């Protein structure tokens, strides 16, 4: 059932990406507001998505037959391999060696955390995320009886914040936030004391308020800060944008996404017919807006309902695990799914700033889909290697 839910999401993603490509390359690819042709069809993304999902399902089935404990025990291997790919991108930017580009910038941001090989791109922090979940689960399992002692908690926080710091330096704050939420979910599952949880939330709220009140004019004028301010003050009433051009550029993507979702109404305009509203990155970060336009409110509810079921199944598998190691792994993976879905949908609805977080299973990207199915395989491994079964 769990794998079928994931397969349904991948099938919906291929449908959405195929319709996006058809619109881009057909006579219907005329923007309703500008009246201009916005692009050329590109079915390659849909084909890559389908191929990656097919390979991913096979990988998930293979991993489900491998005891997750053995994968945790070989942590030095995957730590060296994954972070060995991440670290070069801290200092190497857009350096091409033959067909390989290290420190590739896949967008219009300061994020140089990608590798490009021919026509394919790969972000090693996605693979490192899986390694982090496994090593953090092992760390929690080893110290769970002393978790709330300041010394042990300090070591755990160091384990969490070192990768977050590395990813922040790369310029990928969206992924850094996801790592933070993963760590919080795993700490909560391990039984972190409420005094630490409440204290952490209070400290973060106070720090954010102080930073906004006293240092907002000094934090920087980069796109990330502007995107945060655009959510708080979308009409630029406080004059945060230095020019009207900057303001329009910052709000354009979310504004178009909001229009696309609203235009879908209850049942949508259809995947291969009806009105079309162009949205930048509609195949990637803003795929939810495309689905809203094509399938309407009902389609969005179906997509979110299936994703919610995947999250619940992930956490429930962890809750039924006979050992805490399996529980911690599922808590981390469930936290990753939950965080990405919440942030991505919030971006599309203009409730959160755009920080480059994709929608699991739906956003275009073969390597991302493969990483998701590796996570699915780990959850299935926890399920298969415990005598207690989900829901009895």
Predicted regions and their residues:
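Loop-to-helix entry and N-terminal half of a specific, functionally important transmembrane alpha helix
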Residues: 317-356
């Amino acid at each position: 059932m769990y794998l079928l839910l994931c397969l349904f999401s991948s099938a919906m993603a291929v449908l959405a990406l195929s319709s996006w490509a058809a619109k881009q390359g057909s006579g219907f690819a005329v923007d309703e507001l500008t009246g201009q042709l916005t692009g050329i069809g590109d079915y390659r993304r849909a084909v890559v998505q389908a191929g990656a999902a097919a390979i991913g399902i096979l990988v998930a089935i293979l991993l489900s037959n491998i005891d997750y404990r053995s994968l945790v025990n070989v942590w030095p291997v995957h730590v060296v391999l994954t972070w060995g790919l991440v670290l070069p991108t801290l200092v190497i930017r857009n350096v091409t060696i033959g067909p390989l580009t290290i420190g590739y910038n896949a967008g219009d941001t300061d994020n140089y955390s990608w590798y490009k090989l021919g026509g394919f791109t790969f972000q090693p922090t996605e693979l490192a995320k899986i390694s982090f979940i496994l090593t953090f689960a092992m760390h929690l399992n080893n110290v769970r009886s002393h978790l709330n002692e300041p010394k042990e908690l300090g070591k755990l926080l160091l384990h969490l914040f070192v990768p977050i710091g590395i990813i922040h330096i790369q310029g990928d704050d969206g992924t850094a936030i996801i790592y933070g939420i993963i760590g919080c979910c795993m700490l909560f599952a391990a039984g972190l004391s409420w005094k630490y949880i409440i204290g952490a939330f209070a400290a973060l709220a106070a720090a954010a308020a102080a930073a906004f009140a006293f240092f907002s004019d000094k934090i920087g004028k980069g796109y990330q800060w502007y995107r945060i301010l655009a959510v708080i003050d979308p009409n630029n009433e406080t004059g945060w944008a230095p020019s009207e051009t900057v303001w329009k550029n910052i709000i354009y993507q979310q504004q178009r996404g909001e229009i696309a979702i609203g235009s879908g109404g209850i049942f949508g305009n259809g995947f291969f017919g009806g009105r079309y509203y162009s949205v930048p990155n509609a195949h990637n970060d803003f795929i939810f807006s495309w689905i809203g336009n094509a399938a309407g409110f009902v389609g969005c509810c179906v997509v979110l309902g299936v994703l919610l079921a995947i999250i619940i199944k992930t956490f429930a598998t962890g809750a039924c695990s006979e050992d805490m190691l399996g529980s911690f792994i599922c808590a981390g993976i469930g936290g990753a799914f939950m965080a990405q879905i919440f942030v991505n949908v919030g971006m599309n609805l203009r409730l959160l700033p755009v920080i480059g977080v994709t929608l699991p299973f739906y956003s275009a990207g073969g390597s991302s889909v493969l990483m998701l199915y590796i996570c699915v395989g780990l959850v299935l491994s926890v399920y298969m290697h415990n005598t207690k079964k989900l829901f009895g």
